[in-house]
Design a protein with these regions (language model features):
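FIC/Doc superfamily catalytic core
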Residues: 1-151
Length: 151
């Protein structure tokens, strides 16, 4: 997304940026892009809690960055996991969370993640590995998601 390269001075750890990014990514596809979901899903939190939980996640991420609480890769991966867990949008949550993680790791001086790259021919196996890594994150084990992000 070319416009993300011209965002100097933009704080990505804000709700405004989170929603604007989703709108920019998917605005040509879905009229509701950049708006929170209004219904429950089999993944994610209650829609009424999205802003509360998202605000907490972004404050935590800012704290992790300011205090060097974790290595840069882990901060970005934890942010990614939290965004997917909250699931603020009806669709596009994973792609959106991966881009935000890439933007954050780049801002922290690292290289963007490969997120499994193109090495697996079977997209089903790639997705299964990604979902398994996210589930490990649900148990506070971020090693599989870190490994997947850099694979």
């Amino acid at each position: 997304m070319a416009w993300t390269q011209h965002r100097r001075g933009t704080d990505i750890l804000t709700e405004g940026f989170v929603f604007a990014l989703h709108g920019r990514m998917f605005g040509d596809v879905w009229s509701w892009a950049g708006s929170t979901r209004k219904t429950g899903k089999n993944i994610g939190i209650d829609p009424a809690q999205i802003h509360v939980q998202l605000g907490g996640l972004l404050r935590n991420a800012r704290y992790w960055v300011e205090r060097d609480s974790f290595a840069s890769d882990e901060i970005a991966v934890r942010l990614h996991h939290g965004l997917v867990a909250i699931h603020p949008f009806p669709n596009g949550n994973g792609r959106h969370a991966r881009l935000i993680a890439d933007l954050l790791i780049t801002e922290l001086g690292g290289a963007p993640f490969s997120w499994g790259g193109q090495t697996l021919c079977d997209i089903g196996a790639l997705r299964a590995g990604y979902v398994a890594a996210l589930r490990a994150g649900d148990r506070h084990d971020f090693a599989p998601l870190l490994a997947f992000a850099r694979s």
